[in-house]
């Protein structure tokens, strides 16, 4: 038997047992800051054989860091750059977290107090002295930003040569090289026979009607590509205002927005009770309407929109809309995102939605960046940071020999920053709709990928095929009856010459292998030969993203190499279709894999992000897919849980509310199963699919010492002992003794059945014989 290669991060699906978990807060049923909890009675030990792992964690980290430095530091000394220059003094949020959180309920309250304003003034004086020094030495050309709320720093224009010199000054604490975050992109389509929970409206937006919470008394800041505030989804006004026009008037002068737009007035930034603040940090004006992007409007609609077409997750939440991507160039800059984050903190938001990022994110940005620390300060102040894991598939995607990794190098992690930062809750995507399947030869369940149109929208294979049939057959299908078709395996790669000895395929489905000619050409040749549909199977491992171009093609789909090889082993066979043949939904293939380079668990939670219908600029609606859509779905759930916690436990601090929200989410998530009925790896789904109902109705939740998330990160086994100790606690929220059953499911990466050289990105369950 060949040795199995075990990936360094294993699945620990813990359905917890606690023989006697007694409530420690019986009097008021409120969790304490440092609760006395009942730990699981015995530490669980799992022995792992790792003899086949060739690279140490240090070797892998060294290689990745070297590649990252080469990529990001490829500057000439004369190149103009933007850098954040930090000073030694505390920022407002640091002072709040360190000393003033006992006096002020939120960092916003402190920052807008007399004490906070005085501190901000002192910070500005120190920054002015530094600017004078830098200009006197000829090291900078322009000051972009003055930061005081979440970081004590200035953003300046300089050259890369001067950047290195600035970092050596005694008056400078550190320098941060500006990074560029990807302009959010949406993706169309997803498919993967097991039924997972579908708790969404027909739009794919999370259905929150099972609870009474609607988001009243909460505020969400959305950092994105632009917004159409006039859309009907934003016209229903909330029942309760946290931020009023008076609040905006009182603090506007202290906000970064005012520092860049001289004479900025309330009428410029206050849109409505629903949208109390808007500003474009990338282009330095109050016009947040996007130049050429529907992304931000779509995201905001998912979180809190409401009209006769869509219902958002938290319809009564207020939305602070912050445009951080420029109109005429790609990429959001670190300095603009920091400026928006500062103003979001000043406004006192509950949560910040960031459907943006760069793939293969690190725990800290290049050059010893302090950005991670900034996010940690925001988290410490009690604001929930909800971020997209990114749409980067796996690290093997797009490779010359397949879309998955070799078994000798199974590291598939592409999860992106800022979701890799400790403070950020990293969100993976599951489809918002179930997946159709076909039964091949009476026994094989066949999942497929839709082809895309020239506009990158998914085609609809089943409906296109059924609509091409006689009316009698159409009625049978729509009434739930089965339709069976014959398929014919075409030799070679589906070129004209390959049909020479096939015979008549009129009314049949052509099974064609990928390779040599285009997908469009394969489908057109099959059509000309009389086929009613075409199935293209991959010649390498992984899925096919298939565009059919502008031609009038027959219905065409793609399937995996493994499935296609089984079908092609027969010259002919049958394919049975039925309108009720639907399963899932399943994890989105585009959703980035973890872990982080330091073997941290990211993503941490899953939400619906595949084929989500929401608002777009101009009053319209569209279906988009991406972790960018999963993130607002999760963000809406987060603010509803925060509303629940604040109402049930009013004495908790903002920090306690944020921590408990994450722990409830991760403790009660539903484990997502793949088409084989096995759990997806936590490197793909995190804790599982978020459940609002479970979160607000659970009698207990899990905590882990030393971390504010309900997760166990085993990291590396440096001494190669093969033994991991895992300890966690159960917090009992009820007045009764709770008993749970404990089970542990260990799993590893399965190997492709077609060549045994590539991982299949599917789970293989471990047992005593493995």
Q: What residues fall within each predicted segment?
A:
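Surface-exposed binding patches on compact interaction domains or structured appendages
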Residues: 702-712, 735-770
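C-terminal subdomain of the subtilisin-like protease fold in secreted/lumenal serine endopeptidases
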Residues: 353, 426, 555-568, 605, ...
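Subtilisin-like serine protease catalytic core
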Residues: 78, 97, 204-333, 347-350, ...
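Structured lumen-facing ectodomains of secretory-pathway proteins
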Residues: 232-241, 246-252, 256-266, 283, ...
């Amino acid at each position: 038997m060949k040795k199995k290669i075990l990936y360094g991060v294993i699945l620990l699906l813990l359905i917890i047992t606690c023989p006697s978990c007694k409530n420690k807060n019986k009097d008021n049923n409120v969790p304490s800051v440092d609760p006395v909890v009942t730990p699981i009675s015995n530490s669980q030990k799992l022995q792992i054989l790792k003899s086949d792992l060739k690279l140490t964690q240090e070797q892998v980290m060294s290689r990745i860091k070297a590649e990252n430095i080469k990529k990001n530091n490829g500057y000439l000394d004369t190149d103009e750059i933007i850098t954040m220059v930090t000073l030694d003094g505390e920022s407002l949020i640091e002072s709040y977290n360190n000393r003033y959180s006992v006096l002020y309920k939120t960092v916003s309250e402190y920052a807008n107090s007399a004490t906070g304003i005085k501190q901000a003034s002192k910070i500005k004086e120190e920054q002015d002295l530094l600017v004078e020094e830098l200009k006197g030495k000829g090291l900078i050309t322009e000051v972009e930003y003055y930061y005081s709320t979440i970081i004590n720093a200035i953003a300046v224009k300089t050259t890369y040569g001067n950047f290195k010199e600035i970092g050596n000054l005694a008056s400078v604490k550190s320098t941060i090289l500006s990074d560029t975050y990807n302009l959010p992109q949406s993706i169309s389509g997803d498919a993967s026979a097991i039924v997972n929970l579908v708790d969404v409206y027909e739009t794919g937006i999370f259905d929150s009607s099972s609870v009474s919470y609607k988001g009243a008394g909460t505020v969400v800041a959305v950092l994105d590509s632009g917004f159409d505030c006039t859309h009907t989804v934003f016209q229903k006004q909330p029942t309760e205002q946290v931020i009023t026009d008076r609040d905006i008037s009182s603090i506007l002068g202290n906000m970064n927005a005012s520092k860049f737009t001289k004479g900025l007035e309330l009428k410029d930034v206050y849109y409505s009770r629903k949208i109390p603040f808007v500003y474009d940090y990338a282009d330095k004006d109050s016009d947040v309407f996007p130049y050429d992007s529907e992304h931000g409007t779509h995201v905001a609609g998912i979180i809190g929109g409401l009209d006769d077409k869509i219902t958002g997750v938290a319809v009564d939440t207020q939305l602070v809309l912050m445009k951080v991507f420029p109109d005429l160039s790609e990429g959001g800059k670190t300095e603009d995102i920091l400026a928006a984050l500062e103003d979001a903190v000043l406004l006192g938001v509950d949560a910040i939605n960031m459907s943006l990022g760069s793939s293969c994110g690190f725990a800290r940005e290049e050059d010893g960046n302090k950005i991670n620390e900034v996010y940690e300060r925001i988290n410490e102040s009690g604001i929930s940071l909800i971020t997209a894991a990114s749409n980067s598939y796996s690290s093997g995607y797009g490779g010359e020999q397949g879309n998955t990794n070799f078994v000798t190098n199974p590291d598939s992690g592409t999860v992106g920053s800022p979701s890799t930062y400790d403070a950020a809750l990293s969100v993976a995507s599951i489809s918002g709709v179930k997946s159709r399947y076909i039964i091949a030869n009476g026994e094989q369940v066949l999942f497929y990928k839709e082809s895309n149109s020239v506009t990158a929208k998914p085609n609809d294979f089943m409906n296109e095929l059924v609509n091409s049939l006689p009316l009698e057959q159409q009625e049978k299908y729509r009434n739930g009856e089965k339709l069976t078709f014959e398929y014919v395996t075409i030799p070679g790669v589906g070129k004209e010459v390959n049909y020479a000895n096939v015979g008549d395929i009129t009314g049949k489905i052509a099974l064609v292998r990928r390779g040599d000619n285009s997908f469009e050409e394969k489908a057109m040749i099959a059509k000309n030969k009389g086929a009613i549909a075409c199935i293209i199977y991959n010649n390498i491992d992984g899925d096919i993203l298939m565009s059919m171009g502008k031609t009038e093609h027959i219905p065409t789909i793609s399937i995996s190499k493994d499935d296609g090889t089984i079908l092609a082993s027969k010259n002919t066979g049958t394919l049975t279709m039925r309108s009720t043949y639907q399963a899932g939904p399943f994890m989105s293939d585009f959703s980035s894999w973890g872990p982080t380079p330091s073997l941290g668990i990211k993503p941490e939670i899953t939400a619906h992000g595949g084929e989500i219908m929401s608002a777009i600029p101009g009053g319209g609606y569209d279906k988009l897919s991406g972790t960018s859509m999963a993130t607002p779905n999760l963000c809406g759930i987060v603010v509803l849980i925060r509303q629940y916690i604040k109402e049930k436990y009013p004495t908790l601090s903002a920090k306690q509310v944020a921590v408990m929200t994450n722990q409830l989410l991760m403790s009660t998530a539903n484990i997502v199963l793949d088409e084989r009925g096995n759990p997806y790896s936590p490197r793909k789904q995190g804790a599982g699919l978020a459940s609002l109902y479970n979160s607000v109705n659970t009698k207990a939740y899990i905590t882990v010492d030393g971390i504010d998330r309900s997760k166990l990160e085993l990291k590396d086994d440096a001494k190669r002992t093969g033994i991991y100790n895992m300890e966690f606690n159960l917090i009992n929220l009820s007045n009764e003794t709770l008993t749970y059953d404990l089970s542990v499911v260990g799993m590893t990466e399965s190997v492709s059945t077609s060549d045994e050289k590539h991982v299949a990105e599917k789970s293989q369950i471990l047992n005593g014989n493995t």
